[in-house]
């Protein structure tokens, strides 16, 4: 069996400081953007020349917070309620033989200043400090497959959930709204 070694090309800066705060997919939190800071020797403007012409990027990264836990042949995907087991290769679980993840994110801009190259990213699903091993432009003609099927994740999850409040809680929320003059819910 072959072994491979990869260099870290950058690090993610995001509002999510721990893995339990991270959305399950990019795009779920509108204001959850971040940055990708390239590290030496990859922090050169030439390395990103032409990238500004793409709206979205694939970010390949390391699941650094779960890699020491090792891999598992079966996992319980959250989309199945955490009750049914699936083979790890049929999921996007972090507990993989090679702890490599990929995320499709919007590229909002590129800043090159002195020895820094920073990619400004839209909504993402990565914890702050995530090591990045590669970036690739998203190619809509090749990667958007309208006839593809996806087993248990064929449709996007519901955007919201109904929440019911007790009359006492509703009264407390109304008091807060009046006091602060803005909607609480």
Where are these regions (language model features)?
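Short coil-to-beta-strand transition motifs
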Residues: 2-8, 95-105
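Active-site acidic/histidine clusters and adjacent loop/turn architecture
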Residues: 13, 19-20, 24-80
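A residue-level detector for short acidic-glycine micro-motifs
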Residues: 14, 106-109, 123
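Short, conserved beta-turn/loop elements at beta-strand boundaries and strand-helix junctions
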Residues: 17, 110-116
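Short acidic (Asp/Glu) patches
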Residues: 72-95, 101-103
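Short, solvent-exposed secondary-structure boundary/capping segments
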Residues: 114-124
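Flexible glycine-rich active-site/ligand-binding loops centered on an Asp-His dyad
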Residues: 122-153
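Conserved small/polar residues in nucleotide/adenosyl-binding loops
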Residues: 184-185
């Amino acid at each position: 069996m072959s072994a491979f070694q990869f260099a870290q090309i950058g690090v993610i800066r995001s509002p999510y400081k721990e893995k339990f705060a991270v959305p399950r997919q990019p795009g779920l939190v509108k204001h959850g953007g971040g940055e990708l800071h390239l590290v030496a020797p990859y922090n050169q403007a030439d390395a990103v020349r032409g990238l500004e012409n793409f709206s979205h990027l694939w970010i390949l990264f390391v699941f650094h917070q779960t890699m020491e836990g090792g891999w598992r042949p079966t996992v319980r995907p959250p989309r199945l309620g955490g009750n049914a087991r699936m083979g790890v290769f049929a999921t996007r679980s972090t507990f993989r033989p090679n702890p490599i993840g990929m995320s499709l994110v919007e590229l909002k801009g590129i800043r090159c200043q002195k020895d820094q190259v920073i990619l400004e990213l839209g909504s993402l699903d990565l914890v702050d400090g995530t090591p990045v091993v590669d970036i690739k432009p998203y190619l809509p003609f090749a990667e958007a497959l309208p006839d593809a099927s996806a087993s248990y994740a064929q449709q996007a999850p519901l955007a919201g959930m109904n929440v019911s409040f007790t009359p006492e809680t509703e009264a407390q929320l109304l008091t807060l709204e009046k006091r602060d003059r803005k909607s609480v819910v």
